[in-house]
């Protein structure tokens, strides 16, 4: 009887229902993996695995280019980006392309160029992927030893890690150069409601940059997500880029120490699990950043944050009722607390009502009205500018919430009908993807550790019930 699994099997495998679905060198008998296990068949075929990864990169870049052009084609300059379901153009606008004062889009040509460049890049990657998957050498070790590798070769693995770190560092510096020399980036805090500007006075103080990492993640602290000026963000990228490049050089030049050799599992599946774990962390951090941070993700493009929409509603009604003659400093609400203004636990003057829970919100349209002790009553009575009223009314009606009832005091039933904030999309998608990647991390880590320890969980193939059943065909 033909065995449907490799005798030298290191992984639990599934049986093929149809033995003809095989490619030479990539069939189940040679690799221990069925056709549907995808890249697992290529674990020891470095050339073919390269093809799979390059083709995958091509698909990713093709999506980016095609979606970019789709958004440009559908873009209406008269409406805010966040009303149009856009998720790519806000990123380009944040980088300072095509926008002017107040986040107004003045030129869509840079967006078009971005889309076309990504499409062209995807064609190059697609060709490379097909070439290496079908025509190139199956393994790179013999012909191109620099690009070849064996998973157990610890020194080679850390060299590859080092190269990746250097590339990440260069990526961080690309943002720095854009902000410093190539037109600047969009600063939502620029006076009068935001503008594109070059960053001139970088924050490089390690106590400031690494102070963010030491902050509590709760309340007014907010860990790294609390960053609210571009000097700190760009300065942080200088530090990150430098650390990545220096760490990359270190990993290329050194071999793993004995404790590292003992601590880690050195196999392809182990590296996959480490990567998935890192991506899960990225996903969770990105989720928090896009949900709470309105500096790295300006509200002009992504819509207001939840707290921002709630505070904007309180501000809008304060403005309205003050015009109608209300004394906003002393009016009481139904609970006996201040209707429009009250004090926070630490004594600052804050907005009253249900939005009190968001009292530590910082937003460019609100900060000019604060004094040393919170909101300044004199400024609220005399200094409110038309652009602040317009922006808060706009944000009040575009909360990133899909609830049919009030959330944080914001009436959301209108929004649930025909508006989903890009913040909701980006935060939810990154949380869900981060969670799936984390589960994948646990799964592959468990398998890699089991294989390294010399045992695996799986069905004993010799007594598998399906072997005694009539074949499907």
From Swiss-Prot:
One of its GO terms (biological process) is photosynthetic electron transport in photosystem II. It comes from the Eukaryota. Keywords: Acetylation, Chlorophyll, Chloroplast, Chromophore, Manganese, Membrane, Metal-binding, Phosphoprotein, Photosynthesis, Photosystem II, Plastid, Thylakoid, Transmembrane, Transmembrane helix. Residues 1-14 form a propeptide. Signal peptide: none annotated. [CaMn4O5] cluster binds at residue 367. One of its GO terms (molecular function) is metal ion binding. The modification Phosphothreonine is found at residue 15. The modification N-acetylthreonine is found at residue 15. Pfam families: PSII (PF00421). The chain crosses the membrane at residues 69-93, 134-155, 178-200, 255-275, 291-312, 447-471. GO terms for cellular component: chloroplast thylakoid membrane; photosystem II. InterPro entries: PS_antenna-like, PS_II_antenna-like_sf, PSII_PsbC, PSII_PsbC_sf. It is found in: Plastid, Chloroplast thylakoid membrane. Binds multiple chlorophylls and provides some of the ligands for the Ca-4Mn-5O cluster of the oxygen-evolving complex. It may also provide a ligand for a Cl- that is required for oxygen evolution. PSII binds additional chlorophylls, carotenoids and specific lipids. It is a multi-pass membrane protein. PSII is composed of 1 copy each of membrane proteins PsbA, PsbB, PsbC, PsbD, PsbE, PsbF, PsbH, PsbI, PsbJ, PsbK, PsbL, PsbM, PsbT, PsbX, PsbY, PsbZ, Psb30/Ycf12, at least 3 peripheral proteins of the oxygen-evolving complex and a large number of cofactors. It forms dimeric complexes. One of the components of the core complex of photosystem II (PSII). It binds chlorophyll and helps catalyze the primary light-induced photochemical processes of PSII. PSII is a light-driven water:plastoquinone oxidoreductase, using light energy to abstract electrons from H(2)O, generating O(2) and a proton gradient subsequently used for ATP formation. Belongs to the PsbB/PsbC family. PsbC subfamily. This is Photosystem II CP43 reaction center protein. It comes from Piper cenocladum.
